[in-house]
Structures are given as C-alpha cells and as structure tokens.
C-alpha cells in the first residue's frame, strides 16, 4: 500500500495492438479491484506510490521528444539481464529489454521490426544497469521538463495524502488518549444515566466509521493514481516505438540532407536547452530547503541527462561538426557534471528522510492491519459513552457549584457580621461572670465574719439569758424581717439559675457556630472544585480556538489546492498556444517536408486521444476534489452549529446565575434587618444587666443592716449553709467560662485558616486571568493570519483577470493568423493547377516523354490530395483547440466562484472571532467584579473585627491582634487597588482594540472614502463622551471626600470643550477627505489625553483614600 512505483513485478505481454493506448481506469473502486485481483503485476494496474495523471503539456512534450530523437543502435551480441520482464509489444524477433530511447538493429529484412519493450519502472525512473554503449540515447529538454512537472505534481498530491493521513493519525491518537484516561475511571464509575445517552454513543461510532471510510477512499485514490501512472508509462513506451519506426522510414526516404537539417535544429534546440538548464540550476540552489521529496526524481532526471549528453556528443561527432562546437559541448557537459555532483550530495542527505518516511508508512500500515475487531470497538464505544455521561454529570455539578458560590458569598458576609455580634455578646457575658465571681467572694468573707460573731454570741448567751424575755418581742419583729430577707434570697437564686440557663444558651450558640464553621469549610472546598471546573472550561475554550486555527489551516490548504488547479489551467492554455504555433510552422514547411507531415499528423492524432483520456481523468479528479470540499464544508457547518449551541447554553447559565445573585441579595437585606433586631435585643439585655447590678447593691446594703441586728444562731447557721451552697456552685461557673474561652480561641484559629484558604483561591484566580491574556494574544495572531490570507486571495483574483484578458487577445491573433494561412494555401493550390495545365500542353508537344510525364502528374495529384487532407485535419485541430479554450474559460469562472465562497467563509470566521472576543471581555469583567466584591467583603470584615477588639479591652494580646488585622486590611486594600487598576487597563485595552480594528478596516483600502472615515469618528466621539462621564464621577467622589486629592491636577482642554453633537455631525458631512483625516487625528489625541487624566485621578484616589475604592468601582460600572 505504501510502496513506490519501482516495486513492480514482471509485466505480462499485453493483448492490445501497438497503435492503441492502454485503457485507463475510470474510478478508484475499479482500480482497487484490479490491484487486488492481479496483485500489482498485470499490465494495466500497478500497486505503488500515489500521483496525478500526466497533463497535456507533458504528453505533447514527450511525443515531440520521441519524434525528434535520433537513432541509436546496440551491437548484435549485447543482451540485457535474463531476469527482465517480457515486452508489452513484440514488433521484432529480439526478446531483450532496453532502456528508453534505445533501439535494436533489425536482424534481416523481415517486415517485423526488431524492437524490444522496456519495463515501466525503468522507463519512468531510469533504474536499470546496462553497459555504457546501451546508455547513449537522446533525452531532450522537453522530456526532462515533462518528467519534472509530472513528478512535482505527484509529490504535491503525495504531500496532500500524507497530510490527510497525519490528521487522521492525530485524531486516532486523541481518541486513544481519551479512552486510556477514561478506562482508569470506568472501573469505579457506573450510573444508570448511561442508558439515556446511547444517542451520543451512536454519533461517536458514526464519526469513527466516517473517518475509516475517508481513509479507505484516500487509499483507493492512491491506487487509482498509481494505475494511471503505469498506464501512461506504457502508452509512452508504445508511442516511442512508433516514433522510432516512422523515423527509420523517413530517413530511408529523404536521405542525408534532411538528417543534416534535423541535426542543425537539434543543435539550436540544445543551445536553448542549455540556457534553460542554467536557469533551472540557479533556481534549484535557491530552493534546496524544498528538495526533501524531489531528490528521488532528480536521480532519474540526472541519469537521463547524462545519457542524452553522451548521445548528442556522439551524434555531433558522427555528423562531422566543427571542433569548436565539440569543445563548447564538452564545457557544457563539465558544468552539468559539477551541478550533478552537488545535487548527488543533497540526495545522499535526503535518502535518510525517505527511509524515515517509509518507516512511518509501514507503521501506519501495521496499525491499520492490526485494527481492533468488532468486540474491541464495542468496548471502546461503551467507554466513550460512559465518558460522555460523566461529562454531563460534571456539567450539572458545575451548575450546582455556581449556585453554592453565590450562597457562600452571601453567607460569608452574614457570618462576618454574626461573628461581630457574638464577640460583643461574649465580652458582655465575660464581664458579667467576673462581677458574679467578685460577689461570691464578698459573700464568703461575710459568712466567715458571721461565724466569728456566732462564737462570741455563744459566749455571751449565758450572760444574756436574763434579757431574753425583753428581746422576745424584738425577735418576733426580727423573724418577720428574716422572712422578707429569705424571699429576697430566693429571688436572687432564681436570677442565678436564669444566668445558668443563659450560659447554656451560649453553649448552644457556640455549637451552632462550630456547625457553621464546618459548613464554611465545605463551601470553601466547593469553591476550590468550582475553580477547577472553571479551569476545565478555559481549557475547552483553548481547544475551541485550536480547532478554529486548524479549520483556518484546512481552508489555507484548499486555497493552495485551488492555486495548483489554476496553475494546471494556465499550463493547459500554454500547451494550446504551443500547439497553435506548431501548426503554423507545419503549414509554412508543407512544401519542403512532405514526408515528415505524415508522421506529425499521426502524432497529432495520438495527442488528441491522449488529451481526451487525460481530460477525462482530470475531470474525474476535479469532481472528487469538489466532493471532498463539500464534505469539509458540511463538517465545518456542523461544528459551527455545535459551538453556537454551547454559547447559548452558557448564556442561559449566566442568566440563571444573575437571577440567583439577585435572590441572594434580597436574602442579604433580610438578614441585615434581622441583625439590627439582634443588636437592639443585645442593648436591651445590657440595660437589664445594669438594673440587676443596681438591685444587687441595694440588697448588699440591706444585708449589712440586717447582719448587725441578727442575734440568733439559728438564722446565722441557715445563712452559713446557704453561703456554702453558693460557694460550691461558683467554681463550676468558672470552669464553664474557661471552657467557653478555649472554644472561642479555637474558632479564631479556624477563621484564620479559612482566610488563608480564601487568599489561595484569589491567587488561583490571578493565574486564570493570566491564561486568558495568553489566549487573547493567540486570537490576535489568528486574526492577522486571516487578514493576510484575504489580501493574497484578492491579489490572485486580479492576476487571474489580467491573464484571462491577455489569453483572449492571443487567441484572437492566432485565429487571424490561421485564416491568413488558409488564404495562402488556396493561392498555392491555384498555382499548382496552372502548372498542371502547362504540363498538359507540353504533353501534346512531347510525345516521346509520355510515360515520364504521366508518372509526374500522378505523383503531383497524390501530393495535392495529401495536402487537402492535411489542411482539413489542421482545421479540425484548430476547432478542437478553440473548444478547449472555452472549457478552460468555464473552469476559470468556476474557480472564481470557489474563491468568492472561500472569502465569504473567511468573513464568517472573522465575525465568529469577534463574538468570541466579546464573550471573553464579559467573562473578564465578571471575574474582576467577583474579585472586587470579595476584597470589599474581606475589608469590611477586618474593620468589624478591629472595632470589636478595640471595644473589648486594652490588653497586649488584643493590641497585637488589632495590628495584625490592620496589616491584613492594608494588604487587602492594596489588592483592591490592583484590581481597580486591572479593570481600568481592561477598559483601555478594549478601547485600543476597537480603535485598532477601525484603523485596520480603514487601512485595507488605500484611499478610504469620506463615509468610511466618518463612522470611526463618531465611534471615537462616543468613547470620548464615556471618558468625560467617568472623569466626572471620579472628580465628584474626590470633592465629596477630600478636595485636596485633586490638588495639582488640571483637566485637559478637551474635557471642558463641549459642543452640539448635531452641528458637529453636519460639519463632518461637509468636510473634505483631508479635513476628516485631521479631525480623526485630533479626536484620537483628545481620547488619549482623557484616558491619561483618568488614570492619574485613579492613582491619586488609591494613594490618598483607598477606602472609597468601592464607590470608584460603582462609577466604573455606571460609565461602562
């Protein structure tokens, strides 16, 4: 399948007649059957390398070369190797095989002429090993040029086929990599959703079958081309033998004078060929980098040149030319030999590359021979279907994660405010617990003093028994007071139990905080996954851009193919012009070379048959190319539809996300209102605590008064017992408070970890932004390539139009000259008739020479009949040539239509690129907005934390925390500055892109019309008004905050210059082209000044008042 044309087996003798050319296969399927049936060894089919059919120029030049080549003979005893195959045409008794241009001498006077066939591979490529005598055949320059052209055509088609094979190989490798990656995950992944996605599997399987069918069609085309090359080579060999026979016949009739004329013409032709060869060598030196695939053909052409030079030298020496001419020929041969040595050196370098190409072909052959069976293909299809289902599930998860991100944003803001409120409540509860501890200690001291007083009272009880009677009344009164105090104590114990319940509520709130922190951690993980999915989306976008670049490459290849086809058409026109010139020369030399007319008429008839076959094969090749172009267009339209569907889905997702953001903002407002209610409740709790403190103070005063009056031991013991119970309860409270403090410190650590995670995610967002900038550069490069291709196509269309006009003029001149020739022929026939009449008169006078005169008249009549037949044939050929010219014109018109369609497709691609650029801008703006919102939320959170710490107390630890929070706040402010600068830079880049696009559209035409200049002027004026509005927002913010920010800044003159828009537009309509150009430059300068002034204001705001950057962002959004 990948072999070259040299690997041909033995050729069996053909059953065709010598005068008929072998029939060419009409379709690649027929060629495929023939190669399979004969195994590449029959006379009509050859398995080998790919190539194109010979053009009409090549066929004509080959026929002319064989017609003018001189005879050369082998000795009677020289034979070619015994293993050479048989001839396709046995005209004589000799069975040996000869290289092309070499003839065998006739062994006797038999009518069967001794000529031997040569193998097609030796004729085509010259790879035969014969003695030096047999290598002396004439190969003129036209044959070498024809071979070079055919081999170059074959090489271009081989390159195309190899390129298609490489593309198919890349597709196969991509599929293999996808399958290998999915096989690892397929073992652990299985879901019932795969049943719903069988349609996707079928689509993938159909794509694979289509690729295989394309590869099979390419192989069949290669085989078809190989068969056509072999058939044309056989036909050339037959034509060469016929030309040799006609040359022998003509040489036996005309004699030596005609040979002398032919040799002189050959010498002149050789001189012209030598000049052409010098030019060709100069071009070859320039194009050495493109000789990787031509070196193999150069070997055969150089061998043919050696043989032709040796033959020509021997011919010149045998005809007795001067010594000077021989010296000149020797000098030419020496130069040619030097050039050949240089080319041989290059050949040795490029043979290695040929070996590498053969190795790659064999690998491809083995891969496609060892293709997997149906079971493996089914398994691969199932893997692909599972992979597609997994991709769909990941897309659903992506949507869910986007919703969770929006929830996280709102919950992040809420959690920061709730943390602030909780910190305040904890500080209040901590101060209240300290106050309660102090109270318990005071009560303990009072109980100890009361115990001492009780012991003193016991000692004094004996002395006071006499006074008991008097004090009983006082005791009854004191009992009532004690009962009142007991009720008060009960109320205090109830309050203490309430404080315990409040502490339990605080514990529950702390557990809720823990749960919320865990939820925050999960949301952070979800954010990380969301960022990874965003990266995958960006990778998909890059793949889409690469696919666009590949499509552009394929379009460039199609344009290159169209160029090649145009070159082929130009060659056909040149061939037709050369044919007309040859016919004119034949009409001039009719009287001198009557015998050569017979041979040339027969060669022209053979040329017509060859041209018909070549034209049919070329038409079939063109039809195949058009089918492939239509197939590629359908595939491109399919890809565009898929991309449009993806864009619509992305737009729908964005709309959903925006709706969710609006809902979340409403939730935020509701939660802020609830936070305000909670703050009011906290203030009320603080006031109730103050009231309780005042009540406690009053109770203490009452207790002091009552302690002085207490005299009984029983009441003191009861008080001591109650005090001991309270003392037991107080250390449990202190332990609980310590536990709460430890939990608060742990929650602080977790919040710091969450902050570090948020910082890491921000860094990942920066990396994503850098990748997007790189992709923007790639898109700009692709746009420049498309513009260059469009310019080249416009130039080529203009050149084609010019060439058509020149060809029309030449064809008209040729027709006029042909008519003149016909008139001159009619005059010559009248003169001949007059001479015949005179000879009839002389017959009457000269009766003695009657027999001689009768013979002369008969011969003259035969000559006249031949002239008339030749003239009719020439007229028919002129008509055929005119028809061919009309066909060429029609083909050129079709090529123009194809060029217009390619230009339209390029315009569509440009519009698609502009849409992609607009989407990229939207994505960048959204990313910058998200970053700015996150930074503003973090700054507000830091401010709240700082305020809480400043309110709590003035310990060193809190001061350090406040300093750390301030440093973090400064860092966040710097990041917010950077983000605002990035957004300003993005606006400036968008403005510069629009300006560059408008200037580029204006530069495509050398002299733009006034209407083309007015449109960019209006766009620039619109941008100028936007910049003025933005500068007005910034200056208003600066004046509200601090007018000193704008100190030293003076706005440009264009900022204060205001005019009526309608009047300015009317003035533009009345301006000349030069005035419009000056106005365009002025407006561009004004826009540049305004942009620079806006950048300076923004820098001043960032330096002096970074806390109003949020308002600057709002101004940006309003101006955009």
Curated annotation (Swiss-Prot):
FIP-RBD domain boundaries: 1050-1112
Sites bearing Phosphothreonine, chain numbering: 38, 1050
GO BP terms: protein transport; regulation of calcium-dependent activation of synaptic vesicle fusion; regulation of presynaptic cytosolic calcium ion concentration; retrograde transport, endosome to Golgi; synaptic vesicle priming
Location of Phosphoserine modifications: 17, 21, 37, 55, 75, 94, 824, 1009
Cited Pfam families: Cast, RBD-FIP
Organ and tissue specificity: Widely expressed.
Biased segments, Basic and acidic residues type: 801-824
Keywords on record: Acetylation, Cell junction, Cell projection, Coiled coil, Cytoplasm, Cytoskeleton, Golgi apparatus, Membrane, Phosphoprotein, Protein transport, Synapse, Transport
One GO CC annotation: anchoring junction
GO molecular function, a single term: PDZ domain binding
Residue span of region Disordered: 1-54, 801-840
InterPro entries to which the protein is assigned, alphabetical: ELKS/CAST (IPR019323), FIP-RBD_C_sf (IPR037245), Rab-bd_FIP-RBD (IPR019018)
SUPFAM superfamilies: Eferin C-derminal domain-like (SSF144270)
Compartment annotation: Cytoplasm, Cytoskeleton, Microtubule organizing center, Centrosome; Cytoplasm; Membrane; Golgi apparatus membrane
Record field: compositional bias (Low complexity): 13-28
N6-acetyllysine found at: 10
Top-level taxonomic group: Eukaryota
Biased composition (Gly residues): 40-51
Membrane topology per record: Peripheral membrane protein
Residue ranges the record marks as coiled coil: 144-992, 1060-1104
Chief place of localization: cytoplasm
Role summary: Regulatory subunit of the IKK complex. Probably recruits IkappaBalpha/NFKBIA to the complex. May be involved in the organization of the cytomatrix at the nerve terminals active zone (CAZ) which regulates neurotransmitter release. May be involved in vesicle trafficking at the CAZ. May be involved in Rab-6 regulated endosomes to Golgi transport.
PANTHER family according to UniProt: ELKS/RAB6-INTERACTING/CAST PROTEIN, ELKS_RAB6-INTERACTING_CAST FAMILY MEMBER 1
Record's subunit section: Interacts with the GTB-bound forms of RAB6A isoform 1 and isoform 2 and with RAB6B. The interaction was strongest with RAB6B, followed by RAB6A isoform 2 and weakest with RAB6A isoform 1. Part of a complex with CHUK, IKBKB and IKBKG. Interacts with CHUK, IKBKB and IKBKG. The interaction with IKBKG is independent of CHUK and IKBKB. Interacts with NFKBIA. Isoform 2 interacts through its C-terminus with the PDZ domains of RIMS1 and RIMS2. Interacts with ERC2/CAST1. Interacts with SDCCAG8.
Name the UniProt record assigns to this protein: ELKS/Rab6-interacting/CAST family member 1
Source organism of the structure: Mus musculus
Gene: Erc1
């Amino acid at each position: 399948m990948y072999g070259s044309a040299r690997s041909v087996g033995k050729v069996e003798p053909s059953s065709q007649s010598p005068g008929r050319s072998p029939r060419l296969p009409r379709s690649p399927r027929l060629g495929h059957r023939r190669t399979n049936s004969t195994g590449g060894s029959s006379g009509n089919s050859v398995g080998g390398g790919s190539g194109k059919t010979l053009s009409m120029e090549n066929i004509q030049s080959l026929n002319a070369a064989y017609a003018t080549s001189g005879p050369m003979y082998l000795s009677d005893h020289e034979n070619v190797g015994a293993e050479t195959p048989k001839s396709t045409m046995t005209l004589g008794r000799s069975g040996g095989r000869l290289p092309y241009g070499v003839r065998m001498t006739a062994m006797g006077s038999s009518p069967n002429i001794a000529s031997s066939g040569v193998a097609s591979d030796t004729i085509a490529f010259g790879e035969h090993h014969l003695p030096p005598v047999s290598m002396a055949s004439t190969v003129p320059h036209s044959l070498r040029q024809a071979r070079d052209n055919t081999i170059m055509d074959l090489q271009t088609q081989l390159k195309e086929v190899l390129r298609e094979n490489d593309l198919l190989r890349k597709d196969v490798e991509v599929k293999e990599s996808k399958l290998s990656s999915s096989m690892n995950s397929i073992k652990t992944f299985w879901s019932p959703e795969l049943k719903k996605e069988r349609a996707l599997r079928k689509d993938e399987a159909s794509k694979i079958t289509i690729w295989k069918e394309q590869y099979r069609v390419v192989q069949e085309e290669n085989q078809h081309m190989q068969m056509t090359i072999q058939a044309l080579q056989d036909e050339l060999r037959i034509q060469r033998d016929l030309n040799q026979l006609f040359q022998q016949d003509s040489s036996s009739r005309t004699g030596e004078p005609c040979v002398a004329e032919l040799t002189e013409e050959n010498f002149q032709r050789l001189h012209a060929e030598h000049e052409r060869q010098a030019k060709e060598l100069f071009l070859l030196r320039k194009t050495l980098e493109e000789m990787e695939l031509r070196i193999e053909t150069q070997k055969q052409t150089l061998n043919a040149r050696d043989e032709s030079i040796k033959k020509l030298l021997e011919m010149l020496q045998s005809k007795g030319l001067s010594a000077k001419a021989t010296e000149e020929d020797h000098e030419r041969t020496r130069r040619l030999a030097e050039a050949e040595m240089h080319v041989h050196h290059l050949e040795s370098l490029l043979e290695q590359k040929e070996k590498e190409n053969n190795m790659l072909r064999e690998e491809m052959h083995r891969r496609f021979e060892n293709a997997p069976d149906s079971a493996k293909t089914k398994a691969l299809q199932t893997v692909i279907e599972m992979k597609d289902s997994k991709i769909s599930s990941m897309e659903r998860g992506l949507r869910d994660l986007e919703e969770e991100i929006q929830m996280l944003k709102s919950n992040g803001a809420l959690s920061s405010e709730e943390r602030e409120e909780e910190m305040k409540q904890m500080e209040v509860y901590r101060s209240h617990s300290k106050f309660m501890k102090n109270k318990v200690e005071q009560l303990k001291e009072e109980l100890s003093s009361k115990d001492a007083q009780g012991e003193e009272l016991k000692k004094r009880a004996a002395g006071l028994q006499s006074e008991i009677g008097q004090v009983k009344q006082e005791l009854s009164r004191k009992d009532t007071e004690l009962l009142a105090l007991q009720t008060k104590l009960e109320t205090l114990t109830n309050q203490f139990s309430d404080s315990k319940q409040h502490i339990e509520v605080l514990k529950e709130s702390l557990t809720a905080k823990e749960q919320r922190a865990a939820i925050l951690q999960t949301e952070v993980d979800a954010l990380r996954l969301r960022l990874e999915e965003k990266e995958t989306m960006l990778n998909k976008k890059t793949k889409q851009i690469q696919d666009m670049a590949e499509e552009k490459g394929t379009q460039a290849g199609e344009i290159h193919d169209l160029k090649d086809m145009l070159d082929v058409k130009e060659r056909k026109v040149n061939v037709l012009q050369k044919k007309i010139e040859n016919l004119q020369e034949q009409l001039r030399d009719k009287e001198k070379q009557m015998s050569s007319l017979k041979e040339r008429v027969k060669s022209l008839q053979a040329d017509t048959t060859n041209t018909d076959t070549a034209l049919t094969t070329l038409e079939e090749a063109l039809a195949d190319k058009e089918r492939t172009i239509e197939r590629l267009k359908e595939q491109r339209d399919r890809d565009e539809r898929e991309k449009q569907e993806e864009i619509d889905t992305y737009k729908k997702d964005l709309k959903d996300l925006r709706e969710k953001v609006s809902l979340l903002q409403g939730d935020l407002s509701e939660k802020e209102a609830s936070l305000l209610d909670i703050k009011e409740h906290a203030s009320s709790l603080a006031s109730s605590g103050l009231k309780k403190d005042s009540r406690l103070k009053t109770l203490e005063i009452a207790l002091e008064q009552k302690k002085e009056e207490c005299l009984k031991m029983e009441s003191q013991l009861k008080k001591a017992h109650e005090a001991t119970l309270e003392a037991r309860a107080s250390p449990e409270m202190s332990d609980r408070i310590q536990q709460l403090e430890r939990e608060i410190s742990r929650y602080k650590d977790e919040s710091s970890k969450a902050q570090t995670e948020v910082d890491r995610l921000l860094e990942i967002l920066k990396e994503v932004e850098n990748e997007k900038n790189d992709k923007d550069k790639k898109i700009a490069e692709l746009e420049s390539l498309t513009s260059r291709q469009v310019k080249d196509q416009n130039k080529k269309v203009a050149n084609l139009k010019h060439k058509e006009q020149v060809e029309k003029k030449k064809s008209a001149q040729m027709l006029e000259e042909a008519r003149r020739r016909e008139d001159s022929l009619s005059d010559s026939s009248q003169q001949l008739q007059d001479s015949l009449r005179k000879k009839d008169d002389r017959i009457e006078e000269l009766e003695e020479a009657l027999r001689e005169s009768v013979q002369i008249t008969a011969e003259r009549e035969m000559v006249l009949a031949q002239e008339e037949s030749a003239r009719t044939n020439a007229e028919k050929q002129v008509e055929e040539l005119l028809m061919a010219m009309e066909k060429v014109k029609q083909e050129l018109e079709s090529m123009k239509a194809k060029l217009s369609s390619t230009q339209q497709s390029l315009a569509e691609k440009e519009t698609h690129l502009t849409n992609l650029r607009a989407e990229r801008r939207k994505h960048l703006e959204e990313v910058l907005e998200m970053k700015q919102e996150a930074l503003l939320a973090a700054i507000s959170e830091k401010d709240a934390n700082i305020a809480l710490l400043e309110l709590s107390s003035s310990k060193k630890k809190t001061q350090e925390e406040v300093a750390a929070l301030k440093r973090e706040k400064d860092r966040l402010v710097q990041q917010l500055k950077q983000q605002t600068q990035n957004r300003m830079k993005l606006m400036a880049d968008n403005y510069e892109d629009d300006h560059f696009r408008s200037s580029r559209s204006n530069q495509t035409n050398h002299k733009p019309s006034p209407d083309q200049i007015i449109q960019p002027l209006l766009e620039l004026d619109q941008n100028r008004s936007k910049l003025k509005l933005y500068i007005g927002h910034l200056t208003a913010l600066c004046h509200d905050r601090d007018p000193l920010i704008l100190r030293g800044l003076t706005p440009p003159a264009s900022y204060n210059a205001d005019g009526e828009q309608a009047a300015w537009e009317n003035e533009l309509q009345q301006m000349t082209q030069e005035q419009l150009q000056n106005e365009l430059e002025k407006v561009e300068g004004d826009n540049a000044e305004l942009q620079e002034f806006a950048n300076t204001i923004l820098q001043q705001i960032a330096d002096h008042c970074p806390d109003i950057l949020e308002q600057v962002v709002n101004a940006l959004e309003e101006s955009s």
